[in-house]
Amino acid sequence: MRLRFLGTGTSTGNPEVGCSCEVCTSTDKKDWRFRTSALIEVDGKYILIDCGPDFKMQMLETFKFSPFKALSGVLITHEHYDHVGGLDDLRIFCRSKQVVELYAEAYVAEAIQERIPYVFRENKYPGVPNLRMNQIENAPFFVNEIKITPIRLMHGNLPILGYRIGNLAYLTDLKTIPEEEYTKLQGLDVLIINALRAKEHITHETIDEALEQIKKIKPKKAYFTHMSHTFGLHEEQQKMLPENVFVAYDGLEIYV
């Protein structure tokens, strides 16, 4: 299994417009972050996790001008714009009348259908993406024969989902994990987890909180994602982390 970090930034991305802090003015491209998303390849099948407003540019960075394969499915973690704002750009994957399957909880599916209703109408305008919504619950399901295990997370007071595929778990935007969900996170080779910044935040984990989760879950390796410009410079933060914890960056590919 291969995972590519398409984006590792928070809702505003890095750099922020109008900001002159050391991160936003950094010349290190690892400090430049699109909105958080990931592309997973399993046995030649592609699964996208979240589809934010930077999706088109992320695809250009990933595939350049090379042909790309079909998407087996898109897993949605929650309804916030930085995670679903690029769904219309899935139209490139819908040529030749191909359907892209979306997977989301009922309340998330409803929110998406309200925001882009033209995508789900029976008689679509020519050229709009051909998306099919699949409502899921907090129970395992399959995407093109690949087992997906949802993980209940709390984004402040908002219930959202993380996902486990094989021995990799992708947990973004969480503040807490319900105690009963930890059994789903045993035996991980790789944990991907949000670490917004050092300072306390009401709906996202801080760096220290993410490190505490890593200690509790005990993956072989862990990667931080969904980082703001106040997270700090990539290289400086990496030096302060345990040897099995890494600051992810856009374009990083890992193998599990």
Per-region residue spans from a language model:
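Active-site-proximal loop/helix segments of hydrolase catalytic cores
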Residues: 154-161, 165-194
